[in-house]
Amino acid sequence: MKQFAKRMVCLLTGILMVLAMLTGCSGTPKDEKSDSLVPSSTTEERGVLRIGMECAYAPFNWTQSTAEVANGDTAVPIYGTNDYAYGYDIMVAKLLAEELDMDLEIHKVEWSSIVLGMNAGDYDIILAGMSYSTERDQSVDFTEPYYVRDNVIIVNKEGAYANASGLSDFTGASCTTQIGTSWVHYVPQIPEVEQLTYYETTAEVVMAVSMGTADCGILDEPTALSATLANDNIAYIKLPAEDGFTVPEGTSLNICIAVKEGESALQKTLNDALVAISLDEEKMAELMNTAIEVQPLGD
């Protein structure tokens, strides 16, 4: 009888051990529980709007070492760095984030790889002073414009073209601009132009003109105005309609937010938010003027 009882105890103990092992392997799986803690890959469910921008294109966006801004606003931390980003793009991004009840995450990236980074999933959108073009529209989708710009020519105040007033006055000039932008399509409109190497950033374009490496450069008016405030050697010329640029086929003066191709839900969300924040021409001008006023000159 005692031997039988011992055998029963051993049997029950074994059964309990097996059940404990099965419970550990089944029930709520550990991996499944961990997965539930991982944020959704969709922008809205994650609650964070991840934005790619150069942070080197004042007054649209720039890098600064502190969060303080002269207008009392606060710059946004740049992901993975100790620096901060501010400018027109950040001001618009903050308005959108507030409207959407989302946090901002700014990713600093070189212009030449900015679309690749978004398509690789490094960030959700590009809000970086990017103009619409049919070529870009083949690889990304665009929102409605959040700014409309004019393009101008920058010159050295002491250079040969300082007194130019129309496009024809630049005949034979050497010209540069930023690579990968719609501005490269404007350079050939200068009669008998000498096309120079294009630069990675607008700051390099300004420096080339300031140093006399190039007779002139093509930028948008806000960037050119910022350049004149930061560099005493630079002036810019706004061309008259009768002797000025024509918008090249397939390009636009509209500055838009880019999303991954096919991200129609996010595109609509952003378009609705742009309407909600009432970003009309007057407000665009107000924000841009503020960005120009508070940019850190000489940085």
Where are these regions (language model features)?
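C-terminal motif of bacterial Sec signal peptides marking the signal peptidase cleavage site
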Residues: 20-24
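Beta->alpha turn/N-cap motifs
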Residues: 53-57, 107-112, 121-133, 156-157, ...
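Ligand-binding clefts/hinges and TM-proximal coupling segments of bilobed small-molecule sensing domains
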Residues: 27-32, 182-199, 237-238, 268-299
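Periplasmic-binding protein-like
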Residues: 147-155, 230-271, 295-299
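Extracytoplasmic small-molecule ligand-binding "clamshell" domains
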Residues: 31-129
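A ligand-binding cleft/hinge motif common to bilobed small-molecule-binding domains
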Residues: 113, 129-139, 186-189, 210-211, ...
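Bilobed "Venus flytrap"/periplasmic-binding protein-like clamshell domains
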Residues: 55, 82-98, 130, 149-206, ...
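Acidic, polar ligand-binding/catalytic clefts
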Residues: 94, 98, 103-169, 243-249
